[in-house]
C-alpha cells in the first residue's frame, strides 16, 4: 500500500490529535473544535458504512457553506470514498446529470433543495442513500440522526485511504454544455508549495517599503518579533537580494514540510497556531474549487475556517464577522464580491485591523477595486489567483505601498509557461499568442473522459501540464498577459458558463431558429451573459418567454441578462458561429435599447 501521509483523512486526524480543542469551523454562534468535527464526521461515516457504502463509491454534497459540508467530505474520505460537489443553484436536469455521470451512491443534501431532487430521483439508479440536512422525508435519513451513530473511527472492511485513491471530484462546466468531473488526488499536497512559494518570494522585496500597518499588533500586545519587523534594521535586511533568496528558500522548505511532509510535521505546525491563530473567512462557495481548495489548505494547517450564516451574500454580515472573529484572511471571487463590500465600508464603521490577506480566485480584482480596498484596509495584501478546476496559479501580491495598482500579473516560472502551436515556449517580448500551461498543482484528469484528459493534460519535454484553453502573451519583463479563454467560456461573477449549454436551452423554444450568447463586460459581474436570437420564418419571439424558459432549465447565474431579436445569427460556411460579428450585433442592440 502506498504511504498515506498525503491523504486528507490521516492528515486531518493528525491535526486533531495535536490540537483537539482548537476551533475548526465557525458560523455565527455555531462553533466546532477539531475534535468535534472529527467525531461528527466519524459518526456520518459510520452511518454511510452501515447503509451499504463501499470503497470508492461517490458521495455527492448539495449544500451551502457550513460545517456539515466539511464533515460530509471528511466522512467520505475516511471511508476511501470520493466526495463530489453539486452546485446548489442547479435545476433538476443538471442535478440528474451529475448524479448519473458520477454514479453517486449517496447524496448529502440540504432540505431547501429537495424540490430539485424530487422530480429526477427515480432516474438516479445508483443513488441508494439520501441524508438530509434539516427535515428528512420518508425513507431518507436526517443529518442529525446520522450523527447519532458511533463517533469512533469507522471500522473499515477494506484497505484504508491511501495515496492511490481519487481524493475528490470537482464538477465544472464542460465544453459540451454538461458539467464534467475533474479528478484530484492526494498528490495535491505535494504541490501546494508551487502555488504559495512564488507568491511569498515576490512579496519579500516589497516588505522593505511595506505600510507600517502590516506589522501592527493585532491583539493590542506587542511582541519582540513585531518590534523587529517594524524596525529599520528589518527593512534594510529584507531589501538585500541575498537575504530575500535565503529566506525564500527556507520558507519554501517549510511549506513543503507543512503540506507533503510526515504527519508529525502537520501536528507540529498545528500546535504552533495556538500562539498565532489564523481565522480564514471563506466567503465564496465551497461547491467551487476556490472555496473547497481553500478549505483543504485550512484543514491541513490546523487553521480555523469561518462561514457566513446568510443564504445570500450580505456585505454587512461579512464585515461584522471580520470584526467579531478577528479574521486575518478572506477568500472571495473578484469584483462581484468586492464592490458590494466596498459600498458597505463606505456606509458603515467596521474594525478591519485584523485583516492581512485578501484573496480573489476565479475572477481577478480590477485595478480600481484593488486601489479602493487598500484605501480602506491599508495593511492588507491583495492576491489574485488564476483559478480553474483543472489547474491553479497565483499572481504577484499587491500592497498599498506599491503606489499605482497594477492589473493581475503572473510571471513565467517552472510551473507556469506559455506554449505556441508547435509546443515551443513563448519568450518574453515575443508578440506571439500561445496557450497558458500550468504544471504541478493540477488534477489527474476528467472522470470517465479519457479523450478530454489527453487533450487537456499534455506532457511536453517530460513535464505534465494542464492546458485548458486560456490564451496569453508574455511581456518583456516575463509577466504573462491573459487574453481570454479560447473556447469562449463566459466568466460571470466567478461562475464559469459555456455558451453551448445556454444556446441549447434557448433553442428548445419552438419559435427560435438560431441563437448565440457571449459575455459582455459588466462592472459588477466581470461578464454578463448576453445573446441574440433569430426566429423561424413567420414567427415572433417573446423574449420574456425565452428568459422564463432559461430560468426553468438552468441555474440562475447561467440565465442570460439580455437577449435581442435579430434576423439572422452570423455563421461561417462550415456552420461555426462568427463570434466577433455576434459581439458587434450585441453591442449595437444594447446601444439601441439604452
Spell out what each predicted region is.
Residues 1-6, 141-166:
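Flexible, low-complexity linker/hinge segments
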Residues 50-51, 78-149, 159-160, 537-539:
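Structural core segment of the AMP-binding/adenylate-forming
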Residues 190-279, 288-329:
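Conserved AMP-binding/adenylation subdomain of ANL enzymes
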Residues 68, 90, 96, 107-109, ...:
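AMP-binding/adenylate-forming catalytic core of the ANL superfamily
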Residues 30, 45-90, 303, 308, 323, 333-336, 496, ...:
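Conserved AMP-binding/adenylate-forming
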Residues 109-118, 220-221, 235-236, 241-250, ...:
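Adenylate-forming
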Residues 152-171, 178, 201, 265-280:
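Conserved pre-ATP/AMP-binding loop-to-beta segment of ANL
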Amino acid at each position: 500500500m502506498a504511504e498515506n501521509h498525503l491523504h486528507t483523512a490521516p492528515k486531518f486526524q493528525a491535526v486533531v490529535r495535536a490540537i483537539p480543542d482548537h476551533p475548526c469551523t465557525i458560523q455565527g454562534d455555531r462553533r466546532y473544535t477539531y475534535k468535534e468535527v472529527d467525531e461528527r464526521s466519524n459518526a456520518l461515516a459510520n452511518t454511510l458504512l452501515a447503509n451499504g457504502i463501499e470503497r470508492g463509491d461517490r458521495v455527492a454534497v448539495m449544500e451551502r457553506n457550513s460545517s456539515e459540508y466539511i464533515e460530509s467530505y471528511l466522512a467520505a474520505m475516511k471511508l476511501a470514498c470520493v466526495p463530489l460537489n453539486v452546485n446548489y443553484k442547479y435545476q433538476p436536469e443538471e442535478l440528474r446529470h451529475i448524479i448519473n455521470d458520477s454514479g453517486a451512491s449517496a447524496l448529502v443534501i440540504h432540505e431547501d433543495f429537495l424540490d430539485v431532487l424530487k422530480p429526477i430521483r427515480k432516474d438516479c439508479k445508483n443513488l441508494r442513500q439520501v441524508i438530509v440536512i434539516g427535515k428528512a422525508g420518508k425513507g431518507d435519513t436526517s443529518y442529525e440522526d446520522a450523527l447519532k451513530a458511533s463517533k469512533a473511527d469507522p471500522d473499515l472492511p477494506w484497505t484504508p485511504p491511501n495515496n492511490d485513491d481519487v481524493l475528490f471530484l470537482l464538477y465544472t462546466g464542460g465544453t459540451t454544455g454538461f458539467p464534467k468531473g475533474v479528478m484530484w488526488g492526494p498528490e495535491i499536497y505535494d504541490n501546494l508549495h508551487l502555488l504559495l512559494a512564488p507568491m511569498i518570494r515576490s512579496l519579500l522585496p516589497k516588505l522593505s517599503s511595506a505600510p507600517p500597518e502590516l506589522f501592527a499588533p493585532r491583539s493590542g500586545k506587542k511582541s519582540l518579533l513585531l518590534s523587529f519587523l517594524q524596525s529599520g534594521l528589518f527593512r534594510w535586511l529584507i531589501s538585500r537580494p541575498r537575504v530575500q533568496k535565503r529566506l525564500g528558500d527556507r520558507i519554501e522548505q517549510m511549506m513543503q514540510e507543512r503540506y507533503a511532509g510526515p504527519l508529525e510535521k502537520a501536528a507540529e505546525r498545528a500546535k504552533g497556531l495556538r500562539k498565532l491563530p489564523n481565522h480564514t473567512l471563506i466567503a465564496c462557495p465551497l461547491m467551487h474549487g476556490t472555496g473547497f481548495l481553500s478549505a483543504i489548505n485550512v484543514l491541513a494547517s490546523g487553521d480555523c475556517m469561518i462561514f457566513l450564516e446568510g443564504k445570500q451574500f450580505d456585505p454587512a454580515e461579512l464585515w461584522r464577522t471580520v470584526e467579531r472573529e478577528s479574521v486575518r484572511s478572506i477568500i472571495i471571487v473578484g469584483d462581484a464580491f468586492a464592490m458590494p463590500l466596498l459600498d458597505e465600508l463606505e456606509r458603515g464603521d467596521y474594525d478591519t485591523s485584523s485583516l492581512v490577506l485578501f484573496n480573489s480566485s476565479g475572477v481577478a480584482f480590477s485595478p480600481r477595486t484593488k486601489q479602493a480596498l487598500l484605501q480602506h484596509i491599508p495593511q492588507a495584501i491583495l492576491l489574485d489567483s488564476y483559478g480553474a478546476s483543472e489547474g491553479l496559479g497565483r499572481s504577484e501580491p499587491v500592497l498599498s505601498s506599491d503606489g499605482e495598482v497594477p492589473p493581475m500579473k503572473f510571471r513565467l516560472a517552472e510551473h507556469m509557461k506559455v506554449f505556441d502551436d508547435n509546443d515551443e515556449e513563448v519568450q518574453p517580448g515575443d508578440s506571439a499568442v500561445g496557450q497558458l500551461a500550468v504544471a504541478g498543482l493540477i488534477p489527474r484528469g476528467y472522470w470517465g473522459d479519457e479523450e478530454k484528459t489527453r487533450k487537456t493534460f499534455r506532457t511536453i519535454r517530460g513535464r505534465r501540464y494542464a492546458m485548458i484553453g486560456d490564451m496569453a502573451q508574455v511581456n518583456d519583463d516575463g509577466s504573462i498577459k491573459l487574453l481570454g479563454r479560447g473556447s469562449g467560456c463566459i466568466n460571470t461573477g466567478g461562475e464559469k458558463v459555456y455558451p453551448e449549454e445556454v444556446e441549447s436551452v434557448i433553442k428548445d423554444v419552438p419559435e427560435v431558429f438560431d441563437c448565440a450568447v457571449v459575455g459582455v463586460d459588466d462592472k459588477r459581474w466581470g461578464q454578463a451573459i448576453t445573446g441574440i436570437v433569430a426566429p423561424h420564418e413567420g414567427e415572433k419571439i417573446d423574449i420574456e418567454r425565452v428568459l422564463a424558459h432559461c430560468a426553468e432549465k438552468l441555474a440562475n447565474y447561467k440565465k442570460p441578462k439580455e437577449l435581442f431579436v435579430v434576423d439572422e445569427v452570423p455563421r461561417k460556411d462550415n456552420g461555426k458561429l462568427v463570434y466577433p460579428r455576434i459581439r458587434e450585433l450585441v453591442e449595437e442592440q444594447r446601444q439601441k435599447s439604452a
